[in-house]
A protein has these predicted regions:
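A conserved beta-strand-loop-helix scaffold within acyl/acetyltransferase catalytic domains
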Residues: 26-44, 49-50, 56-75
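Short amphipathic alpha-helix that is part of the acyltransferase structural core
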Residues: 1-35, 141
Length: 142
């Protein structure tokens, strides 16, 4: 059965105390060791189970005008492929609506390497996005 938004998962803004949950999703990455105990701001979107404390994915929004950004998409390992695809699609859709409401005229997006294909397909096919080039990301601790 196809996963259903609202029944099998919901997309919502992360609560300010959910930093440790996001840290767990980023396990074995360079950002795992940051201080995730500090209160989060409103820029994090999560896909979660509506009935139990189960977290599927996280995405960071950068609301800026005229170009907003979607960054750091991370999906929990081991979730079923269909659920993974639906979660990624709906998180992107939710995030684009939020950025449009903020006043962004365009959005750029970046994803971790193993999600590039899924992320790119959703942006291109569902939202008529255009690839703008290859990027190499860098992380600098402040």
């Amino acid at each position: 059965m196809k996963p259903n938004l609202g029944r099998d998962y919901i997309i919502r803004q992360a609560y300010e105390f959910e930093g440790p949950v996001i840290q767990d999703l980023y396990k074995n990455t360079l950002v795992e060791f940051l201080d995730w105990d500090a209160p989060l701001d409103a820029s994090w979107v999560m896909a979660v189970n509506p009935d139990k404390p189960e977290y599927y994915a996280v995405l960071n929004l950068v609301a800026s005008k005229p170009i907003g950004r979607l960054e750091m998409l991370r999906v929990r390992d081991g979730i079923p492929k269909r659920l993974r695809a639906c979660v990624v699609r709906d998180m992107i859709h939710y995030s684009l609506l939020v950025l449009k409401q903020y006043g962004c005229q365009a959005v750029t997006g970046a994803s971790e390497q193993d999600l590039v294909t899924t992320f790119g397909k959703v942006i291109q096919h569902r939202f008529h996005g255009t690839p703008i080039g290859q990027f190499t990301g860098y992380l600098a601790r402040l």
